[in-house]
């Protein structure tokens, strides 16, 4: 079985600009490249799981979403970082099982990549990004120092690089 890092996108990898879909608006958060390189070097599969309700709201199309996903993947590849896959929910509301905090996309990724949750981590800037930590034996990092969280498996950090360095100390 494999170990993975489940990454949120907006506010975790890139600067959160509401309903981002234009390449010219893309901006990596400082330290993301270095953090992802550390995690990849440790043997983690890097998997993005993101809510993209802007599609259902009509702000942009699925094609627009795929263009920005492809751009992100190509930019990371320039730094020898491989994103295994981007899983996304295009819906609004609770009618589906794929919109975080629901766990459908996590379980799909687990099946697709033979992931051992007990050796994996989830990283996101919102509590809903880490709902998997409540249901499975997976550790998480909340990249929002203003949030308070009671789950002992979740640690608050300021950014992805800080969380990667903590994971490196635990797994290095």
Describe the predicted segments one by one.
Residues 1-45:
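Active-site neighborhood of HAD-like aspartate-dependent phosphohydrolases
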Residues 23-27, 60-68, 100-101:
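Alpha-helix N-cap and loop-to-helix initiation/capping positions
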Residues 7-9, 50, 124-125:
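Active-site flanking residues adjacent to catalytic metal/cofactor-binding acidic residues
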